[in-house]
Amino acid sequence: PNSKLMPTIPEKFSRVENKFLKKSYSVYDDLPKMKWTFLKDEKKYNIFKMNYSEVKKFDVGSKLHKRFPGQQKFKAYKPLLAELIDSVENYVKIHRLPKPDYNIETKLIRKGDGEFQPSPEEFVEIIMAIVKQKKLEKRVIIQSFDIRSLQYVNKKYPKIRTSLGIDEKEDFENNIKDLGFKPTIYSPYYVLVGKTLVDKCHAAGIKIIPWTVNSIKDIEYLKNLGVDGIITDYPNLMGQIDLKN
């Protein structure tokens, strides 16, 4: 929303200093009425095995994390994807803002299918059911570090944009070869990005949007390399960046 020259994707919707969630989301209006459960051993709880009524009981905003000194402490629950989309759409409509695109990631672990997560195919279908219901096909990007998810999207929904997440120092050519097609976006860990990688992506007709970039210095460096956007925990930093030059 800050500039067409440098799109910014908030990581987990600005997971730390999210004044937008705190002050603008009607989905949290009933928080004081709820009973909250605090966990000492989170490994005993498998969210994949829970129904949403159980998930909604957990307070995900009150526990502070030392990595994020600017975190604001407030009670919050995990909203459903459809609920989140409705809230965002309502907010931009009220404030007469441009409609945003949605970068939705399938978080999958190796050998976790059926125990800690749905299969990639099922995961994508769950997401796409909401995307189609909300008529967001032209405004959604499916991102994943799991190539199975993206391969399924490309096969079943070829018009949907895809973003390949990269967290290992493997060369660009092999990553694209393993995927089997050119994604819309190549999204590597930001420390892996150099001018050569940016040029390779652009030569292949692929946008490059690194993650997770949380300092002005790193944002400026990547901007000067010519990246197409960034993923960050702090989209508010973009107000301090000269995007025109």
Regions found by a protein language model. Give the residues of each.
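Metal-dependent phosphodiesterase/phospholipase catalytic core, i.e.
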Residues: 2-147, 151, 155-161, 181-183, ...
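C-terminal active-site rim and adjoining tail of enzyme catalytic domains
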Residues: 160-245
